[in-house]
Amino acid sequence: MIADRALQALTVNALEPEWEAKFEPKSYGFRPGRGCHDAIVAIHTTASRKDARRLWVLDADLAAAFDHLNHDHILGSLGTFPARELVRQWLTAGVIEAGRFTPTSEGAPQGGVISPLIMNVALHGMEAAAGVRYHTTGTRAGKTVRGCPVLVRYADDLIALCHSRDQAEQVKARLTEWLAPRGLVFSETKTQITHLTQGVDFLGFNIRRYPNGKLLTKPSDEAVRRIRRRLSVEVRALRGSNADAVIAKLNPIITGWAAYYRIGVSKRIFAALDTHVWKLVYKWARLTHSNKPTRWVTARYFGAFNASRRDRWVFGSRNSGFYLRKFVWTPIVRHRMVEGGASPDDPALATYWATRRRGYKPPVGATTLRLLQAQHGRCPLCRGLLLHADREPQSPREWEQWLAAIRMATRKKAVVTWGAGTPDERVALRLIHAHCHRRALDGGHGSRFCPTARPEGLA
């Protein structure tokens, strides 16, 4: 199994640069350097101007896309790729469910390393099929010809912004015909044509144009309901646990959700969620100490635990000093959309991607962010990137996992920066890899501080 996944990864490394040079500008799913936030900003950029004309929306979803991809079409698209036979074997390998083997004559294995790339290969050309035309192609592509629709796709979810309902109907008809040879159809229950004044949900955000002409992007009502429900379930399950357990469980959920939705108009929703969390932990505290008065409970669990915030109602542990983060502590940022057809695989764009990384501020603590910027995103001991990842997390849960991984993989430690072992020895706080820290303790690294390599931006 491990060898097979490694072979799939090797195949992706061989295929991806070729297809990245071909893929359409507004395809954002499962591609290096692109993600959900780019897709949301692409829609916002198209429809946010007061004189915007593309206000009719085809909101479409493909029915069980991974299960029905046509194998012949995929293999034909790969042309003379040397590992084409390997791809065919993966596609027809079959699945084992409940101990029973079922052969696969269509579809791509979900969870496979190569499956997302296969999906993008199968759906390449969708913009052209919908009638989208650009003034320029390649890296600078992005400005569409007047009168044509704009299609934004993330994997098998897509939004087509059109000038009229008739144009939206035409786009749907064209795409229905184009998808048929690929074995795909629209999900009738999840596909609709609507006007932006009614709002549309996409990738967890609600995008709506209001009567005053403003277009606002907010967390969708369904996303808010889900996080409220999850927080309630988690706190209920923690009855009988101590405050440290509550904080350890809720902090990743809060920071992960806030990190994903920080690019929208989310401040009021963040504040409302903080109120919801406060009520949950207050109820937890009252149930934990049912025989204690309210004043005792609030004095024990609430206070100014975060020294950098003037907030006396932070939930925390008097024993450890750990405290519960708040949604509103995550600043709202404006995401900068990736430019046209730019790809990290293009060596001519190395400076562009380095500049883009430098301008990116990950949702980490102020001290961590300051150290990252001072160190140009690199570990001073091994000179490797500290926050390297193939792509930005694409959901609140992925952000939870990413932030947890960063906490596990990095350490803030005092490092000798000058004159080790001399009277002039200087020590400064640095962010280093956890494994570099272990090696330093074992004598694997010298005590002398190693200067960083040429700055290439934050990972």
How would you name each of these model-derived features?
Residues 13-29, 449-456:
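Charged boundary/loop elements
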Residues 22-199, 390, 444:
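Conserved polymerase palm-domain catalytic core
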Residues 88-103, 248-251, 346-356, 408-410:
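Active-site-adjacent bridging/hinge elements
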Residues 274-370, 374, 378:
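Extended C-terminal regions of large enzymes
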Residues 384-387, 424-452:
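Short Cys/His-centered divalent metal-binding micro-motifs
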Residues 386-432:
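Histidine-centered nuclease catalytic patch
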